[in-house]
Amino acid sequence: MSLENKNIIITAGGTGGHIYPALAIAELLRQNKANVTWVGTPNNMEASIVPEYFNIQFIKSSGVRRKGIIKKITFPLKLAYNTLKSRSLLKKLKADLVIGFGGYVSGPICLAAAQINIPVIIHEQNAKIGLTNRILAKFATTICLAFEIENLHKQFSSKQLAKTKIVGNPVRKEIVALNDKARIYTDSSTLKILVLGGSQGAKAINEIIPKLIQKSNEQGINIKVWHQTGKLSLEETKDAYKDISQNHIKDIAAFIDDMAIAYNWADLVICRAGALTVSECAIAGLPAIFIPLPSAVDDHQFFNAQNIVNNNAGFCLRQQQMTLENLLAIIKPLNQDRSKLEQMSKMAKKTLIKNSSEQILDCVKKILNNK
C-alpha cells in the first residue's frame, strides 16, 4: 500500500530515548511518501532536534508523577485542556494516523486522536510500560513493544494483549548497518572502552572511570577510553583525567555527534541502560557493562538490560556495586581472552529485533488499508 498523501502524526518528546526511535520511523514514513508532522513540547529536547528534519507543532504538556499536591490537583484540568487543543490540531492537520512514542506530550495527542476516531499506534521503548502508555493502551489500535514484558497479562486485558506486538526499538540506519559487520577482537595491547553518560551525564560513572583507567594501568591493562560525559560534567571529568597520559584517551566530550563511529571503534561500552542505548549496543554487537540509573521509574533500566545479560552478551551492575574491584573483575578476563568479547558480540546481535522500523511501517500500512 502507498502512503502517498497520508498525513501521519508522530508524537514523542522529553528524552532521546523517545525522540530518536521516533525519528527513525518518521524518516522511513517520509521515504514511503507520507506527510509527516511531529508534535512535541516547546521546552524539551525535541524542540532543538526535530526542526532540522521535520515540521513540528507544539503542545504544552507536563506529567504528574512525583509532583506536588497542587500539580496533581490541576493535572486533570490541564490534560483536558491540552486534549481539546490536540483535537483541534489533528483536525487542522487532517491526520490519518497518530504514532505515540512516549513522553508526556503523547498523552493528549493520542487521547484526542482516539476521541475523533483517528487510529493510534503506541510504542513502548522500555521493558516496563510507562504510565502514559499504560493509559493509552486502552485506546490504541495497535500496541508495539520493544521487549517482552514480565507479567504483561496482569497489566493488559485480553483485548489489549490481542493488539500487542513485539517489534523491538527502531534504531538509526547507520547503526543498524553495523549489525552486518563482524567484530574482530585481536589480542592487541589496547582495550578500547566507550563510556556513555547519556545526554544529561552520569555523575557516578564519570567519577569512577578515570580511577579505573589509573588502576588498570597499574595492573598492566592498557585501556584507551572515549568518554561522553553529558553537558553538565564535561569540565569536572576532564579535570579528573589530568594526570592520565593522552595515550589512554581517545576523546572526552559532552556529546558524540556520530554514535555509529563510536560504536564501531569500541571493544566494550560502559553505560546506563536506557532503552535506546541497550538496543543500539545489541544491534551493533557491542558488549556492555550496564549501570542502570537508580532513580529510573519502576527500575525500568535494570529490566532493559536483562535480555542482554541473560544471553551472556553483557553485564549489569547496580550503581552501588560499581566499584573498582567489580569493574576490574569483569574487565580483566575480557582483556586476557578477547575471544570472550567476540562471543558476547555474536550473542548481543541475536537478542534484539533488527527490522523494528519495517515492522512498525507494516502496522501503519495494515491499519490505513483497513480504514
Curated annotation (Swiss-Prot):
Keywords, sorted A to Z: Cell cycle, Cell division, Cell inner membrane, Cell membrane, Cell shape, Cell wall biogenesis/degradation, Glycosyltransferase, Membrane, Peptidoglycan synthesis, Transferase
Gene3D superfamilies: Glycogen Phosphorylase B
Pfam families to which the protein is assigned, alphabetical: Glyco_tran_28_C, Glyco_transf_28
Protein name listed in UniProt: UDP-N-acetylglucosamine--N-acetylmuramyl-(pentapeptide) pyrophosphoryl-undecaprenol N-acetylglucosamine transferase
Underlying gene: murG
Lineage: Bacteria, Pseudomonadati, Pseudomonadota, Gammaproteobacteria, Thiotrichales
Stated family: Belongs to the glycosyltransferase 28 family. MurG subfamily.
Xref: HAMAP family: MurG (MF_00033)
InterPro entries: GlcNAc_MurG, Glyco_trans_28_C, GlycoTrans_28_N
Pathway: Cell wall biogenesis; peptidoglycan biosynthesis
Membrane-topology descriptor: Peripheral membrane protein
Record's function text: Cell wall formation. Catalyzes the transfer of a GlcNAc subunit on undecaprenyl-pyrophosphoryl-MurNAc-pentapeptide (lipid intermediate I) to form undecaprenyl-pyrophosphoryl-MurNAc-(pentapeptide)GlcNAc (lipid intermediate II).
Compartments, as annotated in UniProt: Cell inner membrane
Transmembrane segments: none
GO MF term set: UDP-N-acetyl-D-glucosamine:N-acetylmuramoyl-L-alanyl-D-glutamyl-meso-2,6-diaminopimelyl-D-alanyl-D-alanine-diphosphoundecaprenol 4-beta-N-acetylglucosaminlytransferase activity; undecaprenyldiphospho-muramoylpentapeptide beta-N-acetylglucosaminyltransferase activity
